[in-house]
């Protein structure tokens, strides 16, 4: 959500920001609707004062035994006008609807661009492997090994679902444990286990609603299946005012995520790159306004560290204004090398939302200055570290062997108890 006072202070700056995000000029309309609303509220306050004055006059006249029928009629008329105006103000949601539909303002360093072709590479890490044999895509390897079953998943659920078996299911569990251990034991994150069914207010608070109404799954009793742990983790501080010395708060969670993938027809129709349900380890930070820049760099470096320890080649991309998420002010994408596709693919996105989500959530922190208490909105950040399905796909493709087996990265072997993934003989019917 946006601060109207900042929009009014520099409408040209706000318009440039919205244009860069593909939304066109918006400031004039916002200011016009705000003036209308303020005018109506001013009129409402005036009418209430008039009614109160007439009510006092009626009481005085009655005590004095003086006829007051005209004043009583005037009071009734004012009450009707007040009720009509109150209803009109309550029903007029044009301003709030407009503000809710607009994305966050990009940071000054964010490159202006329409789509991912305008993203900027910041750095890369790792050496791409030279294969002496034909590279197989992860979905082909998984089916060869009898460990990845898309056909049976389609029978159970439909398209864009998968079943992992045996060593591949163990690898999934190993990755989640490895990532959570690293985040909690080395980097000070608090692990959270949270509901995956959330109410619509919780989704609204982080910017998932109303803009992306069709992108999440909705139950018949108006719950939503959370598309990311960010939804729950950020909302842990909704409606609170925290002491400054309690920040930063850092949360991590492994959860199943659910996405409708609206508008993705024809994209990544095979494999584990784009699914309706997938596991992900998420990082969320709640911090102060002066510390959020450094917190984003820290969070991004932690996500990178996961890839470094897995020895997967990757690059870091600074997203352009047109490719960022709705609530983000600045985002880095980590893209892992997928040899079978001969290109980098997103495996993590780390974003600073500044006070955009906090304004919706009513999340603040307080501090004392010159013995006076002050409060201001927190800054929220989120990052995936990492998406488990895509990490499995990357390991399968980068660590594949000519015989179809897959070498397990060294860092995971204490979790798997094995050094390689071999073919499973226990086929499902």
Curated annotation (Swiss-Prot):
Q: Where does ATP bind?
A: 259-261, 346-349
Q: What is its EC number?
A: 6.1.1.11
What GO molecular function terms would the record report? Answer: ATP binding; serine-tRNA ligase activity
**Primary subcellular site in the record, as a coarse category:** cytoplasm
Q: Where in the cell is it found?
A: Cytoplasm
Write out the entry's keywords from A to Z.
Aminoacyl-tRNA synthetase, ATP-binding, Cytoplasm, Ligase, Nucleotide-binding, Protein biosynthesis
Under the heading InterPro entries, the entry gives:
aa-tRNA-synt_IIb (IPR002314), aa-tRNA-synth_II (IPR006195), aa-tRNA-synth_II/BPL/LPL (IPR045864), Ser-tRNA-ligase_type_1 (IPR002317), Ser-tRNA-synth_1_N (IPR015866), SerRS_1_N_sf (IPR042103), SerRS_core (IPR033729), tRNA-bd_arm (IPR010978)
Q: What does this protein do?
A: Catalyzes the attachment of serine to tRNA(Ser). Is also able to aminoacylate tRNA(Sec) with serine, to form the misacylated tRNA L-seryl-tRNA(Sec), which will be further converted into selenocysteinyl-tRNA(Sec).
* Entry's family note: Belongs to the class-II aminoacyl-tRNA synthetase family. Type-1 seryl-tRNA synthetase subfamily.
What's the protein called, per UniProt? Answer: Serine--tRNA ligase
Gene designation per UniProt = serS
